């Protein structure tokens, strides 16, 4: 086992009857969160709340770099420590906000943070972000940010049989012609052999099934 926190599985209290549940942080504790948790015990509570406010503002799309630098100077925080705290808070909140409130309950969230030895009062501050009045705005901003890249708007395909081609080996061999249109208006056309098309169909169906099974399994464990 590596000495780095990222390689350590997410642990639970020895007496926890739900020791097999999955953390909202994943099966492996993110290194940013592990580093942050080690620093919170000696961190001034006022400084923590100011950092948390900056992280929330960052998640809402605001640029807080100058304010963070000023806080680091006034609180006498080394740059490395400041970066570790911000990265850990950002990762923790981002992971929690990925799950709908119906999947991640407040009590479960608090219990799992306490298992990381995060002080009780700081757990309450973090929970107020994930389950408080700012949640709708954070969800809205996350959806907008996720829509920056173009997505598939239309996908069509048809089977084509070439009866005349310069490649004699391909004569009378069926293929699949595909047309992909994206939300930004761009379109792509390409040709795929039927064997590869069948592999693609199988792979996509398998991935979708595994994703659905994993989602159901995680939801059940988080609700335990």
UniProtKB/Swiss-Prot annotation:
Transmembrane segments: none annotated. Residues 151-215 form the COMM domain. InterPro entries: COMM, COMMD5. One of its GO terms (cellular component) is nucleus. It comes from the Eukaryota. Keywords: Acetylation, Cytoplasm, Nucleus, Transcription, Transcription regulation, Ubl conjugation pathway. Scaffold protein in the commander complex that is essential for endosomal recycling of transmembrane cargos; the commander complex is composed of the CCC subcomplex and the retriever subcomplex. May modulate activity of cullin-RING E3 ubiquitin ligase (CRL) complexes. Negatively regulates cell proliferation. Negatively regulates cell cycle G2/M phase transition probably by transactivating p21/CDKN1A through the p53/TP53-independent signaling pathway. Involved in kidney proximal tubule morphogenesis. Down-regulates activation of NF-kappa-B. Belongs to the COMM domain-containing protein 5 family. This is COMM domain-containing protein 5. It comes from Homo sapiens (Human). The gene is COMMD5.
């Amino acid at each position: 086992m590596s000495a780095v926190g990222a390689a350590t599985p997410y642990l639970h209290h020895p007496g926890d009857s739900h020791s097999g549940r999955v953390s909202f942080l994943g099966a492996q504790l993110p290194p940013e969160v592990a580093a942050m948790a080690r620093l919170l015990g000696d961190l001034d509570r006022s400084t923590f709340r100011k950092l948390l406010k900056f992280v929330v503002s960052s998640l809402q799309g605001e640029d807080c770099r100058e304010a963070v630098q000023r806080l680091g100077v006034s609180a006498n925080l080394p740059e490395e420590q400041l970066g570790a705290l911000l990265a850990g808070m950002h990762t923790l909140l981002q992971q929690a906000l990925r799950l709908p409130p119906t999947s991640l309950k407040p009590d479960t969230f608090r219990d799992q943070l306490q298992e990381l030895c995060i002080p009780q009062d700081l757990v309450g501050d973090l929970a107020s972000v994930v389950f408080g009045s700012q949640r709708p705005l954070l969800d809205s901003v996350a959806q907008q940010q996720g829509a920056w890249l173009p997505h598939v708007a239309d996908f069509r395909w048809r089977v084509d049989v070439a009866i005349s081609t310069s490649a004699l080996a391909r004569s009378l061999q069926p293929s699949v012609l595909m047309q992909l249109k994206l939300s930004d208006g761009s379109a792509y056309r390409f040709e795929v052999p039927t064997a590869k098309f069948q592999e693609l169909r199988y792979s996509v169906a398998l991935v979708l099934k595994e994703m659905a099974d994993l989602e159901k399994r995680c939801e059940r464990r988080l609700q335990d």
